[in-house]
Regions:
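Short, surface-exposed beta-edge/turn micro-motifs
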Residues: 1-2, 28-30, 57-59, 77, ...
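Extreme N-terminus nucleophile/cap motif
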Residues: 1-51, 60, 152-178
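Fold-independent oxyanion-binding glycine-rich loops
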Residues: 7-10, 63-66, 90, 105, ...
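A short catalytic or substrate-binding loop motif that flags glycine-/basic-rich loops and adjacent residues
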Residues: 23-28, 71-72, 131-134
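PP2C/PPM family metal-dependent serine/threonine protein phosphatase catalytic domain
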Residues: 57-76, 166-170
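Acidic loop->beta-strand submotif enriched in PP2C/PPM serine/threonine phosphatases
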Residues: 68-86, 129
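Conserved beta-strand-loop-short alpha-helix elements that form
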Residues: 84-97
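Short histidine
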Residues: 94-151
Length: 178
C-alpha cells in the first residue's frame, strides 16, 4: 500500500533513511509538491535531489507508490495535478480506472477536481464527494499553501503519514549485534 507524507511549513523534511524506507516499501515511483515545486518519477535519487531544494517555509505533500492499478510509469505516480490543484491517494478505490490510469487519477479527474473547481476545496460539496469515494483510503490535496487531508494520519516528528508500514524497512541495530 502506498504512503503519503504531509510536511507542514516550518517542519524539516524526513531523513534520507526515512525517505529510503518509504521508497523500499513502495518502489513503483514517488513524487512531491509544494506551492513552488512539483516533481514525480521513477528515479529515487533524482526525487531526493529535487526534494532537497524544498523551502522549509512551504508545506509539502510526498507520495510513494506501490502499483495496484495502472502500469509502473511516471504518469501514474502521485501527486496528480490539474491547474495547480494537487492530489495524492493512499488505498484502493471502488472506481473503474480509465484506460492505463490509476483508480486515484480516475477519481481525481472524473469526480473530485470538477467539484473542487466548481465549489472550492473547503466546500461541503467537495467534502460530500470525498466521503462518497474515500472508504478506508486517505486523500491529500494542495492548492497553494492550502493543504487538506482526509482520513486518519499518523504524526511522527511533525510530519503526517497515511500509514507507518514503511517503518519495517528502516534499518535497526539488532540488540545483540556486536
Amino acid at each position: 500500500m502506498c504512503v503519503i507524507c504531509y510536511i507542514p511549513k516550518g517542519v524539516k523534511t524526513p531523513s534520507y533513511r526515512m525517505l529510503k524506507a518509504m521508497h523500499n516499501a513502495n518502489p513503483h515511483g514517488q513524487g512531491f509538491c509544494t506551492p513552488s515545486q512539483f516533481s514525480k518519477g521513477l528515479n529515487f535519487e533524482y526525487f531526493v535531489e529535487q526534494l532537497r531544494k524544498r523551502d522549509i517555509n512551504e508545506p509539502c505533500i510526498m507520495h510513494f507508490r506501490l502499483a495496484t492499478h495502472g502500469s509502473i510509469k511516471k504518469a501514474n505516480c502521485h501527486p496528480f495535478n490539474i491547474d495547480h490543484t494537487y492530489f495524492a491517494h493512499n488505498g484502493i478505490l471502488s472506481v473503474r480506472p480509465m484506460r492505463d490510469k490509476t483508480d486515484s487519477e480516475t477519481a481525481f479527474i472524473r469526480y473530485l477536481y470538477p467539484y473542487i473547481e466548481q465549489y472550492g476545496l473547503h466546500s461541503p460539496e467537495v467534502e460530500k464527494m470525498v466521503y462518497n469515494l474515500i472508504e478506508s483510503s486517505k486523500f491529500a490535496f494542495m492548492q497553494g499553501d492550502d493543504v487538506r487531508l482526509f482520513g486518519h494520519y499518523e504524526e511522527m516528528d511533525g510530519c503526517y503519514y497515511s500509514n507507518l508500514r514503511f517503518t519495517y524497512y528502516i534499518p535497526r541495530l539488532h540488540p545483540f549485534s556486536f
